[in-house]
């Protein structure tokens, strides 16, 4: 008794509240001290005590017990304020979407975390006996997260994909949620429910597959005798100490470990906690341990390679079914973890970085050479320090020194005044946080339609031009210049050229348009949109659909017609200096039966044109005939223009014939059917007989028309013609009959005939004499063609205000291809072209260049945005001016009509040359938009963008400016002109006298720009020319002077700013044309704040900005699309790749584990592979070039891939706070990686190619046969591995039963019943269990000579193991030289 009393007196009395962790420690020490049975009694007493106390307390829970944290209100308000500022920055283009999302998540996460930390102290101070507090913080019911949702705020939720919903729930469950919050909360809660249902089954299936792979692995031997192991080093800092201890405890050493000369641990010794601590204190060299990877037995495992059993802490017993234990211990946490998510209901968890705060107020100083500027994750500017940085803070009387660790971000500038507790630096959340990060792609989509522009920081380098992936070298902006692209199936190519003014509602109407020429210019002019100076637009926007696509340009009405179909081939076909541009005329769009015709541009072979040469011709389909016939010019006077031998091609038949090209107003075509037959053929009809339609003429020929037959026999062939028409037998008095071959105009009656009918159409009278006495008259129908004379294209080009002489003239002439009365023969079914529309080239006879008799022409290929365009360049030889006309303009042709006539003449050349210069008449009365054509994604058709009045805003004082009165007067005089013409944002101004203006002009020619800039400075008055702007890229080249870009600019897209008059000198320095301006940048001292956009016009007192939206992109982001491409709303602009923390539940983890175990690829390949290769093992160079290096390389690859698989799976589980011993994973990974694929048929024919065999089996077979077997290692997924086991019964019970059994039967496979499953299926005794010693053979002792090495590292250790393992193989296959010194060479290699 006394002894007991004395012992009691010695016991230490702890007066402490015991919590969960303390309880765990107590239990483990009790077990160590007393053993299992005794401990369980002690714990029973503790349990009883607990129940008694709880009954006495009798806790009840009411809603009043949920106390809200008082500081919540201002915390939430603060967070909202920060979010607002952030939104503004994003709008101005200072941060991009990823940074914004990341920062807003961190703001709310930090708020939520802060509330959670306040919770415990709050309860402790206000109400320590609060039942909620007692229950949750003792761990009896509920955890901190749930209580936080009840009394703090619910915070951020995840959606079912595990992504963040960036709208936080600010209320807690005690206050109640608003409707929006409730819906978001349901979203998160649903995720919890779904996960519980779905993921539980997933986890179960995972467990089943895992067990299937490893069910046959049992401990069968004590020692397999391997000399290999895996090196684990505490030194390399990659592995935290905790994980290092976990890895080592319970393993067996593969090698002796020395501390200097002393051996502190021997081979095959198992490692306990004491030994591990000694390793850590001594910082010993890498420790080589045995793992299941290195075990040499094929289908089981030995005790030493497995290590200690987790149940009782001694070496594992023989007959233990370690495989099944491994499978279950990996699968089981999955089910547990899914259940855990259910209760928290999808609340997001993330991580925040640690901050360094200033200790007191003062000025901060640091060495600026040690830091370099960078951006933080949230887009704030900061300094990155690469080494330890000492920061001093000087307050009035003391200096504070703060040490900032490397890789941290410094958030303040040098010499800045900081206040106490201000955040001055952010420590990078390093490897210490076990958050599982992953790379995510985030696409940024465009908010509006428009045209894409990059800042000059994106490379326009040639190698990037053709790909659609543009990597950003540094942080820069992408701009979307606003404008409305018109989507349509027909590409609207027409006479609209770049910078034409046109209707903004132009293309929104119907698809097919008819020309309606009744609208006169005055009507059209009144209907145009007008707005007064203050920027208000009229209430009524007129409907333009009745204008029917008419543009009033000077004296022509240009009718807009959709010409080209988008499928037609835009690139021309090229035949020997001849280009054909495909073209559809209007009629073809309606019936689409006629074959395609095109404009052909012909250049003489030597490339030299004389005067009046034909440059191009167009075969008009209206003048095309299928049948043969005769052309008559009638009474019209003809004059021959050019007579030249020309080569005509009709379906490959080439004939030289003189081509009479006559210029006539009207001609007649008399159709006839002609058959040319060989002389020997028999004809079934008589000469001068009359036949009907479809009469048989010869054996295989029938007539197409009815009429009179004429047969003429030539030398070797017979010509048979059939004339259609009426036959008259006139009386003798009939005068008309004496003439043959006469054209009679309509309106003349026939004399002396019984019916005095008037002739309605032209007819052709022909006298036919079948015999000497009889004759009759054949009246044949005539097709009449009117040719209107072509328009001289010179009228399309107004005189150039720049007084540059434009020498080249082009005019259009229609020529008839056949002479008067010439018979025209069609060859088989080809159609015959009667009239050809030609473009005749001429030039002025200048006094200076009068000697210029010839012009050189050539095709120029220009490549823009991947589409090749051809330009035709005509050079007057002695004249310095070169003229570039637009040739393969996909716009085909437009319709031009004479002013008064109602007959439209197809003029295919109008569009080809209508944009030769970047200038258009001043008098164009402008509707409201400017066109821009852009290339589409598919690079075939163009799309237009209309910039119209919807994007225009003007600001600024009008009262100060005096000379506007001139404008107002002129407007009163001529009320038809809309006000916006007077000072339109599109740069056109009325030619008002002394209108004081200084436009900066942007034209195609840089030279002109400089001249005008000088004029500006001289403040001269001049007439404003319509502007065309350009942009410069980073090389200073002018980007995109291509006249074929069309966006319809809409005045609402243009912002018009008025500045004070005296501001001109300063402005010109700050604002340059084409410059992009972010929102809220003030250009004047008291000027208006600007909207973001691009400056397209600078004037004395105002600038015009085309509104644009900036998007920020950081380095490494991928830009989609091309410079200047049209984008629609919702198109992808940029893709960011960023890292984010996974949300805190296994939902994301389990699929990850499964992905690794099924060996699916996880990571996307990074764009810069060079960086990956740099990080490879430095020792790799030592392997290369050694005779057996390839073998070592292969071994190392297998070992390395196994280790990295294990690490990947461990990462997922550790991030969930689940501890699984590595050896379980190793057993499974060993099974996945232990099969090889036989790749070549060796001489021995042991294995067939493509067969999967065990790795060890292949090695043994190679040694036995003394010849190499070629194989490659494959990573099988767990499903495939369980279908490729030794036993077909276990395979069949897993999946595809019928197939597996049928195959096994055909192959005659034998099942040795080594595993558990087979025996369970067949009802036998399972060959496992620690009592089952029957199958175990005493292990053979291998007398191996370990190689003595003192200095080792990971690489040498593995190298030695591999060499040792393959020693016999080397001895057999290495050459004689190696035979003499094998032992020394190994040792030398290791000592190096």
From Swiss-Prot:
It catalyses: RNA(n) + a ribonucleoside 5'-triphosphate = RNA(n+1) + diphosphate. GO terms for molecular function: DNA binding; DNA-directed RNA polymerase activity; zinc ion binding. Its main location: plastid. One of its GO terms (biological process) is DNA-templated transcription. The keyword Heme does not apply. The keyword Secreted does not apply. One of its GO terms (cellular component) is DNA-directed RNA polymerase complex. InterPro entries: DNA-dir_RpoC2_beta_pp (IPR012756), RNA_pol_beta''_euk (IPR050254), RNA_pol_Rpb1_3_sf (IPR042102), RNA_pol_Rpb1_4 (IPR007083), RNA_pol_Rpb1_5 (IPR007081), Rpb1_funnel_sf (IPR038120). Keywords: Chloroplast, DNA-directed RNA polymerase, Metal-binding, Nucleotidyltransferase, Plastid, Transcription, Transferase, Zinc. Binds 1 Zn(2+) ion per subunit. It is an enzyme of class 2 (transferase). It is found in: Plastid, Chloroplast. Zn(2+) binds at residues 224, 295, 302, 305. Its cofactor is Zn(2+). It comes from the Eukaryota. Its EC number is 2.7.7.6. DNA-dependent RNA polymerase catalyzes the transcription of DNA into RNA using the four ribonucleoside triphosphates as substrates. In plastids the minimal PEP RNA polymerase catalytic core is composed of four subunits: alpha, beta, beta', and beta''. When a (nuclear-encoded) sigma factor is associated with the core the holoenzyme is formed, which can initiate transcription. Belongs to the RNA polymerase beta' chain family. RpoC2 subfamily. This is DNA-directed RNA polymerase subunit beta''. It comes from Nicotiana tabacum (Common tobacco).
């Amino acid at each position: 008794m006394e002894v007991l009393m004395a012992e009691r007196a010695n016991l230490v009395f702890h007066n402490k509240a015991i919590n969960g962790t303390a309880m765990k420690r107590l239990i483990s020490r009790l077990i160590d001290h007393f053993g299992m049975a005794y401990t369980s009694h002690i714990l029973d007493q503790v349990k009883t005590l607990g129940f008694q106390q709880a009954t006495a307390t009798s806790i009840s829970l009411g809603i009043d017990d949920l106390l809200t944290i008082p500081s919540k209100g201002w915390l939430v308000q603060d967070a909202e304020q920060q979010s607002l500022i952030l939104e503004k920055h994003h709008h101005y283009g200072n941060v991009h979407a990823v940074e914004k999302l990341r920062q807003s998540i961190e703001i709310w996460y930090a708020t939520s975390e802060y509330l959670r930390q306040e919770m415990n102290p709050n309860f402790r101070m206000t109400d320590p006996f609060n039942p909620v507090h007692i229950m949750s913080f003792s761990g009896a019911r509920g955890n901190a997260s749930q209580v936080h949702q009840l009394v703090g705020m619910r915070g951020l939720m995840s959606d079912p994909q595990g992504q963040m919903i960036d709208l936080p729930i600010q209320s807690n469950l005690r206050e109640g949620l608003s409707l929006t919050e409730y819906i978001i909360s349901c979203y998160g809660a649903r995720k919890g429910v779904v996960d519980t249902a779905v993921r539980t089954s997933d986890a179960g299936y995972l467990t089943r597959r895992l067990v299937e792979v490893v069910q046959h692995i049992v401990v069968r031997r004590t020692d397999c005798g391997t000399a290999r192991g895996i090196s684990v080093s505490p030194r390399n800092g990659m592995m935290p100490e905790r994980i290092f201890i976990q890895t080592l405890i319970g393993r067996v050493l593969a090698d002796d470990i020395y501390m200097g000369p002393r051996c502190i641990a021997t081979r095959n010794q198992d490692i306990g906690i004491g030994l591990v601590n000694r390793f850590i204190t001594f910082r010993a060299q890498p420790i080589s341990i045995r793992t299941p990877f290195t075990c040499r037995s094929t289908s089981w495992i030995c005790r030493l390679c497995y290590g200690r059993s987790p149940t009782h802490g001694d070496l594992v017993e023989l007959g233990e079914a370690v495989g099944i234990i491994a499978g279950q211990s990996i699968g089981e946490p999955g089910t547990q973890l899914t259940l855990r998510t259910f209760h928290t209901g999808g609340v997001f968890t993330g991580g925040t970085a640690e901050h360094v705060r200033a200790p007191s107020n003062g000025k901060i100083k640091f060495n600026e050479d040690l830091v370099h500027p960078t951006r933080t994750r949230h887009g704030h500017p900061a300094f990155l320090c690469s080494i330890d940085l000492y920061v001093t803070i000087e307050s009035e009387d003391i200096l504070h020194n703060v040490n900032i660790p490397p890789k941290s971000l410094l958030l303040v500038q040098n010499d800045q005044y900081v206040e106490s507790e201000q955040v001055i630096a952010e420590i990078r959340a390093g490897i210490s946080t076990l958050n599982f990060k992953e790379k995510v792609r985030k696409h940024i989509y465009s908010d509006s339609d428009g045209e894409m522009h990059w800042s000059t920081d994106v490379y326009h380098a040639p190698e990037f031009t053709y790909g659609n992936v543009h990597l950003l070298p540094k942080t820069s902006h992408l701009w979307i210049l606003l404008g409305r692209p018109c989507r349509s199936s027909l590409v609207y190519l027409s006479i609209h050229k770049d910078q034409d003014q046109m209707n903004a509602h132009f293309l929104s109407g119907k698809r097919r348009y008819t020309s309606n020429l009744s609208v006169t210019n005055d009507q059209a002019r009144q209907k145009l949109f007008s707005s007064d100076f203050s920027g208000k637009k009229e209430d009524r926007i007129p409907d333009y659909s009745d204008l029917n696509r008419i543009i009033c340009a000077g004296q022509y009405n240009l009718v807009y017609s959709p010409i080209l179909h988008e499928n037609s081939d835009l690139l021309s076909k090229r035949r020997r200096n001849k280009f054909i541009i495909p073209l559809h005329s209007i009629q073809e769009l309606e019936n689409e039966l006629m074959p395609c015709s095109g404009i052909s541009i012909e250049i003489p072979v030597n490339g030299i044109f004389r005067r009046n040469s034909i440059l191009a011709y167009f075969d008009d389909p209206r003048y095309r005939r299928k049948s043969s016939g005769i052309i008559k010019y009638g009474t019209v006077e003809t004059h021959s223009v050019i007579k030249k031998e020309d080569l005509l091609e009709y379906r490959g038949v080439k004939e030289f014939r003189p081509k009479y090209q006559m210029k006539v107003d009207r001609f007649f075509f008399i159709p006839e059917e002609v058959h040319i037959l060989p002389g020997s053929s028999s004809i079934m009809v008589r000469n001068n007989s009359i036949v009907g339609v479809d009469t048989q003429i010869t054996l295989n020929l029938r007539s197409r028309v009815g009429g009179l037959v004429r047969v003429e026999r030539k030398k070797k062939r017979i010509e048979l013609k059939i004339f259609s028409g009426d036959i008259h037998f006139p009386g003798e008095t009939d005068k008309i009959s004496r003439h043959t071959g006469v054209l009679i105009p309509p309106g003349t009656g026939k004399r002396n005939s019984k019916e005095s009918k008037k002739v309605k159409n032209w007819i052709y009278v022909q006298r036919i004499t079948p015999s000497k006495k009889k004759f009759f008259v054949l009246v044949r129908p005539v097709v009449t063609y009117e040719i209107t004379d072509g328009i001289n294209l010179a009228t399309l080009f107004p005189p150039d205000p720049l007084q540059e002489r434009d020498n080249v003239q082009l005019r259009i002439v229609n020529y008839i291809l056949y002479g008067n009365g010439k018979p025209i023969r069609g060859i088989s079914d080809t159609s015959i072209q009667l009239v050809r529309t030609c473009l005749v080239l001429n030039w002025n006879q200048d006094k200076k260049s009068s000697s210029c008799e010839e012009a050189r022409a050539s095709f120029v290929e220009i490549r823009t945005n991947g589409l090749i365009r051809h330009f035709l360049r005509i050079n007057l030889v002695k004249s310095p001016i070169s003229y570039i006309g637009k040739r393969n303009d996909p716009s085909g042709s437009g319709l031009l009509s004479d002013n008064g006539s109602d007959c439209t003449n197809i003029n295919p050349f109008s569009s080809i040359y209508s944009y030769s210069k970047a200038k258009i008449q001043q008098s164009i009365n402008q509707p409201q938009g400017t066109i821009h054509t852009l290339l589409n994604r598919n690079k075939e058709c163009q799309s237009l963008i209309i910039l119209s009045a919807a994007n225009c805003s003007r600001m600024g004082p009008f009262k100060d400016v005096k000379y506007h009165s001139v404008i107002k007067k002129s407007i009163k005089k001529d009320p038809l002109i809309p006000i916006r013409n007077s000072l339109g944002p599109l740069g056109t101004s009325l030619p008002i006298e002394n209108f004081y203006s200084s436009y900066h002009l942007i034209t195609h020619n840089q030279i002109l720009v400089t001249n005008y800039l000088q004029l500006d400075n001289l403040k001269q008055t001049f007439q404003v020319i319509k502007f065309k702007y350009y942009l410069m890229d980073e090389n200073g080249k002018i980007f995109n002077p291509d006249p074929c870009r069309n966006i319809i600019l809409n005045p609402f897209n243009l912002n018009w700013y008025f500045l004070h008059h005296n501001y001109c000198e300063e402005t010109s320095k700050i604002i340059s044309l084409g410059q992009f301006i972010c929102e809220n940048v003030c250009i004047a001292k008291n000027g208006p704040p600007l909207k973001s956009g691009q400056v397209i016009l600078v004037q004395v007192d105002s600038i015009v900005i085309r509104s644009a939206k900036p998007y920020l992109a950081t380095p490494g982001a991928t830009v989609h699309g091309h410079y200047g491409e049209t984008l629609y709303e919702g198109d992808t602009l940029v893709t960011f790749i960023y890292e984010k923390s996974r949300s805190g539940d296994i939902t994301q983890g389990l699929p990850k584990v499964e992905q690794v175990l099924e060996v699916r690829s996880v990571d996307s390949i990074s764009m810069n592979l060079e960086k990956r290769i740099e990080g490879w093992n430095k020792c790799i160079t030592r392997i290369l070039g050694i005779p057996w290096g390839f073998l070592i390389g292969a071994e190392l690859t297998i070992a390395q891939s196994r280790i990295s698989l294990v690490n990947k799976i461990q990462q997922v589980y550790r991030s969930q706070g689940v501890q699984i011993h590595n050896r379980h994973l190793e057993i499974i990974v060993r099974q996945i990686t232990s099969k090889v694929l036989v790749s070549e048929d060796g001489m021995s024919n042991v294995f067939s190619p493509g067969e999967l065999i065990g790795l060890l089996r292949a090695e043994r077979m190679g040694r036995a046969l003394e010849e190499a077997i070629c194989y490659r290692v494959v990573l099988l997924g767990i499903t495939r591995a369980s279908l490729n086991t030794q036993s077909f019964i276990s395979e069949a019970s897993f999946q595809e039963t019928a197939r597996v059994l049928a195959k096994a039967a055909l192959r005659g496979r034998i099942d040795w019943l080594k595993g558990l499953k087979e025996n369970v299926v067949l009802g036998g005794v399972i060959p496992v269990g620690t009592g089952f010693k029957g199958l175990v053979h005493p292990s053979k002792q291998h007398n191996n000579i370990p190689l003595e090495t003192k200095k080792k590292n990971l690489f040498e250790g593995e190298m030695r193991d591999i060499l040792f393992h393959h020693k016999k193989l080397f001895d057999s296959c290495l050459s004689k030289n190696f035979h003499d010194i094998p032992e020394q060479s190994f040792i030398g290699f290791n000592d190096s």
